[in-house]
Amino acid sequence: MTNKTNTFFNIVVCGVGGQGTVLSSKLLTECALRGGAFVRCAETIGMAMRGGSVLGHVRILGQRDLEQGDGVTVPFSSESDSAVSSLGENGTVTPSLCSKSDSAVSSLGENGTVTPSLCSTECQSPLVPVGKAQLLIGFEPVETLRAYRFCSTGALVVTATDPLMPPAAAVQGLKYNGKAQLAALELEAAEGRIGRLELVNNSDVMDKLGFDKALNVVLLGAALGILAESNSPYASLLSYEAMQGVIETSVKPQFVEFNLKALELGYQLQT
């Protein structure tokens, strides 16, 4: 069945070192890739091993045409797309223009199919531009608020509610409960700048799971549930069933079972 997408979807995942931010972005990337999408991803780790901020960027740029084998459906085809001007000796195609849409092709396969490359000004980087993310998943309140700058108007924000005290703040004896950060996000939602704000209570979730790990996967499940509930065009790419398969093959065997339980719990929060 042919499944095509003409727009791209930007996701930012945020947390602190040790919360599974990088793993979460990789699971989302693998899930979209298996669904036939072109995906770019990157992480900015910083001082992760010292409890520092970690960001994962996932950019779903389009979908392969699954009926055409190795062929592709290049996202965006309009008058503003870059035009192909010449074919080199090695089979590379040189685009004459680089526009704001994603349409340039870089190579021609033996069977006549093309492989896309992105030469646009908007999507040449795997990092999500500020103000362009449609989905933000945060594992810690202050990190969610810090990463909120990446969100577009009307974005979906899924965040954990329980704070994780930064080591430097703990050493100084500072107090931090996350309430001010959550209140700021709720104000953004009330004023319409956040399309939907979903607060996931860490303590309640962990009590139901029976263990205090895999919060990241719980929030992934919650985000997938909201996409499915809202009939998002990306729900088929980032489906619950697809993510189950990714976890089964991408997570260490001893951790598969409780990650699947965490995914199910998060998904059921929204469906």
Could you describe each region identified by the protein language model?
Residues 2-71, 120-271:
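Active-site cofactor/cluster-binding pocket
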Residues 75-120:
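Long, intrinsically disordered low-complexity tandem-repeat segments
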